[in-house]
């Protein structure tokens, strides 16, 4: 009987980044590290770095990850824009915003353009689930985990998902930090992480 063995590094004392942000803890160098990771992943898994036969073989290797790609397709590009069974939001506080989003035809058209790119543009290997729950950190280090959503997709997917998740954390901070001054300070730190992540990503990808 064919068997397999997985060897994993024990990441200790690393903590999931989402937990760190919810507790208002800053991570030194986070923007630089994640910008480098996203840029190098995007470049090295693409035709810009790989020989054509290797890229085609790698694309075929990940083409079978249909079930997990379908989860992303539904949760990101489909379900938020109608009353899907799994949707939840704080009611009645967010009812108006949800109704406005679902009635925005122009937005839904743009989302469909992005969905088409997600399903049809195999430009590079993407982590596929790059958010604060897939990053483990210490006060000065970051490691990316959970690669099971990996697939070949558009260049902008990973970096877009990461920045979008940072923005969600930004808007959620008042629920986690009650002191207005401390909350504002942490939100400004999140914005600085976004800025550094993007600038490092662009510089590394283009160098």
Model-predicted segments: where are they?
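Short beta-strand micro-motifs within the conserved protein kinase catalytic domain, predominantly
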Residues: 1-5
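Short pocket-lining segment of the protein kinase catalytic domain that shapes the ATP-binding cleft
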Residues: 6-14
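Active-site activation/catalytic loop segments of kinase-like enzymes and analogous catalytic loops
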Residues: 156-206
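Conserved catalytic-loop position in the HRD/HxD motif
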Residues: 129, 146
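Conserved protein kinase catalytic/activation segment
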Residues: 134-144
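ATP-dependent phospho-/nucleotidyl transfer catalytic cores
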Residues: 15-127, 138
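Activation segment
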Residues: 13, 142, 150-152
């Amino acid at each position: 009987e064919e068997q397999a063995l997985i060897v994993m590094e024990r990441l200790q004392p690393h903590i999931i980044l989402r937990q760190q942000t919810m507790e208002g803890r800053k991570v030194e160098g986070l923007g630089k590290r994640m910008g480098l990771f996203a840029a190098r992943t995007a470049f090295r898994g693409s035709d810009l770095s790989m020989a054509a036969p290797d890229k085609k073989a790698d694309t075929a290797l990940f083409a079978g990850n249909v079930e997990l790609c379908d989860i992303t397709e539904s949760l990101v590009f489909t379900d938020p824009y109608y009353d899907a069974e799994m949707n939840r939001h704080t009611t009645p506080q967010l009812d108006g915003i949800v109704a406005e989003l679902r009635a925005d035809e122009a937005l839904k058209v743009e989302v469909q353009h992005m969905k088409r790119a997600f399903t049809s543009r195999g430009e590079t290997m993407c982590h596929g689930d790059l958010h604060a729950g897939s990053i483990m950190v210490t006060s000065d280090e970051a490691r990316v985990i959970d690669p099971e959503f990996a697939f070949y997709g558009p260049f902008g997917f990973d970096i877009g998902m990461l920045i979008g998740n940072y923005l969600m954390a930004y808007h959620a901070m008042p629920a986690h930090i009650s002191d207005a001054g401390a909350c504002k300070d942490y939100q400004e730190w999140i914005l600085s992480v976004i800025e550094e992540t993007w600038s490092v990503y662009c510089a590394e990808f283009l160098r």
